[in-house]
Amino acid sequence: MKWIVTEIDGKVASIAGDYRHLAGIAARIAAHSPDAVERIATRKITTDELVELGKALRWEDLCLYGSKFQKAVWKALFDLTHPVDGEDACHFDQAKRVEKSPLMSYSDLAARVDNPQGVRAVAHAVALNPVAYVIPCHLIVPKESVDKIHEIRRSAEATLFRGSDLYLLDSISVGEYAYGPEIKLELIKKQLAK
């Protein structure tokens, strides 16, 4: 699969499998003065190049159009795979159920953005994510799958496989994704292999 990267003045505004986000960005910037944007560029990259780009980008390298709430949800997702304040990526507070895996449910993410009752609003913000993989919406999986992962981990703690991930991604449901569950599974595997 080829990914389309759209940059505005050198900052990544979208990464997608089609041009729909570019059309949305064009509509947003059309409301501004022509001087507001110096340069808009697009390029196509492979999934492996996307993984490398995802490692290199910082939050400040993104040019995002969305509401304050959407940006808060996207930032929480971004923080799943990018170190925050000296933390290791994918290592968070046990109270938020994330443990060392970046896979989480919509309700887990809603709790992370301090809006546990706003699961639907969080799901909507995730669906509008303009920067695939870098803002890793593909790491949101059904709650049942997250629960299964945690149960396997608890069982593993009592064995000599303590701390190992015994679950196979192929054995859990990864849920829906704009580009299909096969692409989502591929992105999850690449993310976890980092």
PLM region descriptions:
Residues 1-116, 150-168, 182-194:
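Basic nucleic-acid-binding alpha-helical/helix-turn surface characteristic of O6-alkylguanine DNA
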Residues 116-185:
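Short glycine/serine-rich loop segments
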